[in-house]
């Protein structure tokens, strides 16, 4: 044994060839501070080995290295700049030391080698992968960029154009795709990885493979003429500007970093990379995106805990109500290996539901994500039926019929009498209180809400709603089922609108008030999209959701919270609803809709909307972007804070994930609580106080005011 640490070991395999094996306690290898320290000690030990002829890096896990330890990031980002630079320098000295060993080096890769894991394999002379390997540099998705030499070595291995695509998109690549661009040198079957790695390093030792030439190219400036460099970096910058936009600086900083370091040797280039990394690490965007990742991990941990505590796992499910939503839920369940019965009273609805599942599977097939066999397996795992016979023995029933309390109550009561006594019932409702639907049930403890978002296959959030009598066992089983479906379940307590819709409608009330005060709805949309960062502004979102749906939900919210959400006369939403302008579904809402070349609805301005709104609005007035953002966001933020104070949602982390995953809250802002921490509670309270005369939705809670006075934060 040359070296033994807690997360890695080094020992000889045969004839002077050493193996450095990453094998941390736990399920995955990460490049945390402890592992980097061990790696430094291991390389120092190898430098003293006179018998050393070659080195192979391997993993004792299913994945090579999944990346750095992101739980350490926020603490690192808060370090003084000089300390952060020192940490980066120490880490990069380790990878440079691997690259400078006087013997050939090789990485034998299985599973994921991402982020720091990818940068580790780039430090070796050769990269051999098995068919399970996936490699990539996802750092820009976290608001940062590679900091362990990724922007230096990858362009010199696969060329600037390919490297810029890898780094700026943050995608991971399968072994065969990585082989095509030269990121890895060969792909073998998993059972051949070890023997092939030993043979390859032996060939390098014997001089059959030019490891020194490869190494020299990696440490030299990029081989690009001035014209090639100009074309490469200008094209990349243009594409990044169009895709990432102004709110996400990491991809553009990465492009500028690779460009600035193109003519430099390795050590000079690493210094440039470190400056780019530090610049990004100090941004609010990086903290927000890392925060989302950590919150997501928190949600996953809660779901794992629920699955362990549940007395029974879900092996069979049923969906009541087919159509697009029911078909989407059944597809999601079946595609993740949980067969689903899809029950409806209407043959056409069943056909529509199966059609939705088939369409989604065809999309997967066309993209090469599944093959025909997998498609057949998923479709055969969905059983469409007009009868309850196949529903009797399922573990979970998801009711997804029309959003009408009487219809839902009747269907729930009917199916409760058919299923087993320990089976769980869940209602996919967006507004109807769970405790109300539970009143007619014999086993209300086995009932909860399970609110999916549309389209089901794309929206990661599922709200799990706990009614007054819902048992912990029911919550645990439904949370575990949602997670098994590949969703992010957030448990909320019952109230009108639950969490997501409850906080969305104050935002729409803010919109109604702005339009009534003379704002142009299209100008409001533009500010909320381009400046604040929502995927859709409020008018466009209402058109997409359906103004009839929004109108109904708004009435429900007004009844549920009359002191804050009751209407003051006719609103912009009322006006559109009264003349049957329901949005995209019938071609006219706030905007008119035409079909684009792909047959998808495209919004266009419609003068008729302004004529219809004129009677309820003051004369046209221009509001600056700060006023629009404040008037739109304060009602939502205040309601989110109230939901936390009332225990509707348990933690800031769960609230922020629900907002990002369920509403499309701008990820670069991290969610309402991260946003409040970023701007400062004192500043927020002062801003909200300026608008307090607009009504109760604009008035901050006493508790928030107290937190602001004490200088507290949510995270």
UniProtKB/Swiss-Prot annotation:
The record marks 119, 139 as: Important for catalytic activity. Keywords: Fatty acid metabolism, Isomerase, Lipid degradation, Lipid metabolism, Lyase, Multifunctional enzyme, NAD, Oxidoreductase. Its EC number is 4.2.1.17, 5.1.2.3, 5.3.3.8, 1.1.1.35. GO terms for biological process: fatty acid beta-oxidation. Pathway: Lipid metabolism; fatty acid beta-oxidation. One of its GO terms (molecular function) is long-chain-3-hydroxyacyl-CoA dehydrogenase activity. InterPro entries: 3-OHacyl-CoA_DH_CS, 3-OHacyl-CoA_DH_NAD-bd, 3HC_DH_C, 6-PGluconate_DH-like_C_sf, ClpP/crotonase-like_dom_sf, Enoyl-CoA_hydra/iso, FA_oxidation_alpha_subunit, FadB. NAD(+) binds at residues 325, 344, 401-403, 408, 430, 454. The active site is at residue 451. Residues 311-715 are annotated as: 3-hydroxyacyl-CoA dehydrogenase. Substrate binds at residues 296, 501, 661. Residues 1-189 are annotated as: Enoyl-CoA hydratase/isomerase. It catalyses: a (3S)-3-hydroxyacyl-CoA + NAD(+) = a 3-oxoacyl-CoA + NADH + H(+); a (3S)-3-hydroxyacyl-CoA = a (2E)-enoyl-CoA + H2O; a 4-saturated-(3S)-3-hydroxyacyl-CoA = a (3E)-enoyl-CoA + H2O; (3S)-3-hydroxybutanoyl-CoA = (3R)-3-hydroxybutanoyl-CoA. Heterotetramer of two alpha chains (FadB) and two beta chains (FadA). Involved in the aerobic and anaerobic degradation of long-chain fatty acids via beta-oxidation cycle. Catalyzes the formation of 3-oxoacyl-CoA from enoyl-CoA via L-3-hydroxyacyl-CoA. It can also use D-3-hydroxyacyl-CoA and cis-3-enoyl-CoA as substrate. PANTHER family: TRIFUNCTIONAL ENZYME SUBUNIT ALPHA, TRIFUNCTIONAL ENZYME SUBUNIT ALPHA, MITOCHONDRIAL. In the N-terminal section; belongs to the enoyl-CoA hydratase/isomerase family. In the C-terminal section; belongs to the 3-hydroxyacyl-CoA dehydrogenase family. This is Fatty acid oxidation complex subunit alpha. It comes from Aeromonas hydrophila subsp. hydrophila (strain ATCC 7966 / DSM 30187 / BCRC 13018 / CCUG 14551 / JCM 1027 / KCTC 2358 / NCIMB 9240 / NCTC 8049). The gene is fadB.
């Amino acid at each position: 044994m040359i070296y033994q640490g807690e997360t890695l070991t080094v020992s000889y395999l045969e004839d002077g060839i050493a193996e450095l094996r990453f094998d941390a306690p736990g399920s995955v290898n990460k490049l945390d501070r402890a592992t980097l320290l061990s790696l430094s000690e291991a390389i120092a030990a190898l430098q003293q080995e006179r018998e050393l002829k070659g080195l192979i890096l391997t993993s004792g896990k299913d994945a090579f290295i999944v990346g750095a330890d992101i739980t350490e990031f926020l603490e690192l980002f808060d370090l003084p700049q000089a300390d952060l630079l020192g940490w980066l320098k120490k880490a990069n000295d380790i990878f440079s030391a691997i690259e400078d060993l006087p013997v050939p080096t090789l990485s034998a890769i299985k599973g994921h080698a991402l982020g720091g894991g990818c940068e580790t394999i780039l430090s070796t002379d050769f990269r051999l992968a098995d068919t399970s390997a996936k490699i990539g540099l996802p750092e820009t998705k976290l608001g940062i960029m590679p900091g362990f030499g990724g922007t230096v070595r990858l362009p010199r291995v696969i060329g600037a154009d390919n490297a810029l695509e890898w780094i700026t998109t943050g995608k991971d690549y399968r072994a065969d795709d990585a082989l095509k661009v030269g990121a890895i040198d060969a792909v073998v079957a998993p059972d051949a990885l070890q023997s092939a790695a030993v043979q390859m390093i032996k060939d390098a030792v014997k001089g059959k493979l030019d490891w020194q030439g490869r190494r020299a190219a990696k440490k030299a400036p990029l081989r690009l003429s001035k014209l090639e460099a100009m074309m490469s970096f200008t094209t990349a910058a243009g594409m990044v500007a169009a895709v990432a936009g102004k709110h996400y600086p990491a991809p553009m900083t990465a492009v500028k970093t690779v460009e600035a370091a193109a003519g430099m040797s390795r050590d000079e280039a690493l210094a440039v990379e470190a400056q780019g990394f530090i610049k990004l690490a100090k941004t609010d965007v990086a903290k927000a995106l890392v925060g989302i990742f950590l919150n997501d991990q928190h949600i996953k941990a809660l779901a794992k805990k629920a699955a362990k505590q549940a007395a029974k796992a879900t092996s069979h499910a049923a969906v009541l109500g087919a159509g697009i939503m029911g078909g989407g839920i059944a597809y999601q369940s079946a595609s993740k290996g949980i067969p689903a019965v899809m029950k409806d009273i209407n043959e056409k609805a069943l056909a529509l539901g199966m059609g939705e599942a088939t369409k989604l599977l065809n999309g997967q097939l066309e993209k090469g994500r599944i093959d025909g066999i997998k498609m057949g397996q998923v479709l055969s795992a969905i059983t469409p039926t007009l009868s309850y016979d196949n529903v009797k023995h399922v573990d979970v029933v998801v009711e997804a019929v029309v959003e009408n309390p009487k219809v839902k109550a009747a269907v729930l009561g009917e199916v409760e009498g058919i299923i087993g006594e320990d089976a769980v019932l869940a209602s996919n409702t967006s507004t109807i209180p769970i405790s109300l639907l539970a009143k007619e049930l014999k086993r209300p403890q086995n009932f909860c809400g399970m609110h999916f978002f549309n389209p089901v296959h794309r929206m990661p959030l599922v709200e799990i709603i706990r009614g007054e009598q819902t048992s912990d066992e029911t919550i645990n089983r439904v949370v575990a089922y949602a997670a098994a479906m590949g969703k992010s379940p957030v448990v909320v307590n019952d109230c009108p609108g639950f969490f997501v819709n409850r906080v969305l409608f104050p935002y729409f009330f803010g919109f109604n008030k702005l339009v009534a005060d003379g704002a142009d709805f299209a100008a409001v949309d533009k500010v909320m999209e381009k400046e604040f960062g929502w995927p859709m502004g409020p008018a466009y979102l209402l058109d997409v959701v359906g103004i009839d749906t929004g109108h109904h939900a708004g009435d429900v919210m007004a009844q549920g919270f009359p002191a804050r959400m009751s209407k003051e006369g006719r609103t912009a939403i009322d006006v559109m609803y009264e003349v049957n302008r329901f949005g995209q579904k019938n071609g006219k809402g706030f905007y008119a809709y035409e079909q684009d070349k792909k047959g998808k609805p495209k919004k266009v301005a419609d003068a008729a909307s302004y004529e219809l709104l004129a009677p309820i609005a003051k004369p046209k007035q221009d509001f600056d972007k700060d006023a629009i953002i404040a008037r739109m966001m304060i009602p939502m933020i205040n309601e989110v804070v109230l939901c936390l104070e009332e225990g509707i949602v348990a933690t800031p982390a769960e609230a922020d994930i629900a907002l990002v995953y369920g509403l499309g809250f701008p990820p670069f802002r991290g969610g309402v609580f991260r946003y409040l921490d970023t701007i400062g509670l004192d500043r927020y309270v002062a801003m909200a106080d300026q608008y307090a005369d607009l009504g109760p939705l604009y008035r901050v809670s006493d508790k928030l005011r107290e937190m602001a006075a004490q200088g507290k934060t949510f995270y």
